[in-house]
């Protein structure tokens, strides 16, 4: 069988923060190969699949991944040798069964995901298709709206801003290439605005600026100024999005925000105020991952006006997503393959979300690599949205550049999600 897995190798490498991660290379009988590198998050949900680290304080402060590498070279390779790489669902189920734990803690979700993605890439090469076409078929032609994280706070930056991400959303562009240009031009102007105000232009983990500001609203004001000075119309050409990462704000049942303790109802009232004053289309993790009652109330009050995204709430997990659907908590899901650990489970989460009328956003992590799989995945699944950072740092730009290549390859068949109303909006 030409597409049988013949060998698998793996290496400990570094991510964009200088922390260890791993890559896997899968080789098939016909000579096709697939390389995949896995990312790592800074603000992680409690219910994410387990990222296996060595725990040896003498190496990388315990963050090494040599155990995960050994799991790939040993039991995973033995299990998958001779299996057909074209049967992704079987490959992923074999990996899940081999691990045998609910959260992939024995082999490590990082080891499992690297092999899962590398297998798909090898299979795509074997049949002579780009990854997005191999995964998505003839209807893989929708280019996602990018949610560009240009101002950072929270766990992604060392500053006094509570909200983790302030994003540009170029909904008014005619193509992905134009959307990327919109964002890049505003990002350049934003740097000038910060310099004129004597504010820091140092960047956070995802490439956004991380200045010290008086309030979270001050960050939104900076974005509005930069959009206008770049020659665009806020709300028409470029809208805004937030990732609050409220888990990071929760202490003793209260949300500690701008120096005060707040209830879930207080936070929702605050978001209502922001929506009245700014063209915000999307709020991610506005409340904590176990505040289901708060999420239900927030969705009831705001869900008809804004996209309410569950990241830590759902962690790309089918069980948690189904609970959100059943309880009317959130109306969109952030999709991070490393939260769940296999390509098949990732696609299943997307399918469940779409069936329920939820929007889907394919996402990077704060600790990234030059791997561009999520760009192909966004097009393959017609997700309509992608989060992959700011307009600097090459591990972020790599994904944008891959989307440019895909759009060019599709030619006239390419459709930009923002142009046809498939980007972020209320249900």
Swiss-Prot record:
Active site per the UniProt annotation: 206 (proton donor), 336 (proton acceptor)
**Cofactor(s) essential for the protein:** Mg(2+)
Q: What SUPFAM superfamilies does the entry give? A: Enolase C-terminal domain-like, Enolase N-terminal domain-like
Q: How is the cofactor bound?
A: Binds a second Mg(2+) ion via substrate during catalysis.
Please provide, in alphabetical order, the Gene Ontology terms of the cellular component aspect for this entry. cell surface; extracellular region; phosphopyruvate hydratase complex
Q: Which InterPro entries match?
A: Enolase (IPR000941), Enolase-like_C_sf (IPR036849), Enolase-like_N (IPR029017), Enolase_C (IPR020810), Enolase_CS (IPR020809), Enolase_N (IPR020811)
Q: Which reaction does it catalyse?
A: (2R)-2-phosphoglycerate = phosphoenolpyruvate + H2O
What is the name listed in the Swiss-Prot or TrEMBL entry for this protein? Enolase
Its source organism is Synechococcus sp. (strain JA-2-3B'a(2-13)) (Cyanobacteria bacterium Yellowstone B-Prime)
What's the gene? eno
């Amino acid at each position: 069988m030409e597409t049988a897995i013949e060998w698998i190798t793996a290496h400990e490498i570094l991510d964009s923060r200088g922390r260890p991660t791993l890559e896997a290379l899968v080789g098939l009988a016909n000579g096709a190969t697939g390389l995949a590198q896995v990312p790592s998050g800074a603000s992680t949900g409690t219910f994410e699949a387990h990222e296996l680290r060595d725990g040896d304080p003498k190496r990388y402060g315990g963050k090494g991944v040599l155990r995960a590498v050994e799991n790939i070279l040993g039991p995973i390779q033995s299990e998958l040798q001779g299996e057909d790489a074209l049967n992704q669902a079987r490959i992923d189920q074999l990996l899940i069964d081999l691990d045998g734990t609910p959260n992939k803690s024995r082999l490590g979700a990082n080891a499992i995901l690297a092999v899962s993605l590398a297998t798909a890439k090898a299979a795509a090469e074997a049949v002579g298709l780009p990854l997005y076409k191999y995964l998505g078929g003839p209807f893989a032609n929708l280019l996602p709206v990018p949610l560009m994280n240009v101002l950072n706070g929270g766990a992604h930056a060392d500053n006094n801003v509570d909200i983790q991400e302030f994003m540009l959303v170029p909904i008014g562009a005619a193509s992905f290439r134009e959307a990327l240009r919109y964002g890049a031009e505003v990002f350049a102007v934003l740097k000038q605005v910060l310099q004129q105000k004597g504010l820091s232009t140092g960047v956070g983990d995802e490439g956004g600026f991380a200045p010290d500001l008086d309030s979270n609203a001050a960050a939104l004001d900076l974005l509005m100024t930069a959009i206008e000075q770049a020659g665009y119309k806020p709300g028409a050409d470029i809208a805004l999005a937030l990732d609050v990462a409220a888990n990071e704000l929760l202490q003793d049942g209260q949300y500690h925000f701008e120096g005060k303790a707040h209830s879930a109802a207080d936070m929702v009232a605050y978001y209502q105020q922001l929506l009245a004053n700014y063209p915000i289309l999307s709020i991610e993790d506005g409340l904590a991952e176990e505040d289901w009652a708060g999420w239900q109330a927030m969705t009831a009050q705001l869900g008809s006006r804004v996209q309410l995204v569950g990241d830590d709430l759902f962690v790309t997990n089918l069980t948690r997503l189904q609970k959100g659907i059943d309880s009317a908590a959130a109306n969109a899901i952030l999709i991070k393959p490393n939260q769940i650990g296999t390509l098949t489970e990732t696609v299943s989460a997307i399918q469940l979300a779409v069936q329920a009328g939820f929007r889907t956003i394919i996402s990077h992590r704060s600790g990234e690599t030059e791997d561009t799989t999520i760009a192909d995945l966004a097009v393959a699944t017609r997700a309509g949205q992608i989060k992959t950072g700011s307009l600097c740092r090459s591990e972020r730009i790599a994904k944008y550049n891959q989307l440019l290549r895909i759009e060019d390859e599709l030619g006239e068949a390419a459709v930009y999600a923002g142009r046809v109303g498939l980007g972020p909006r209320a249900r």
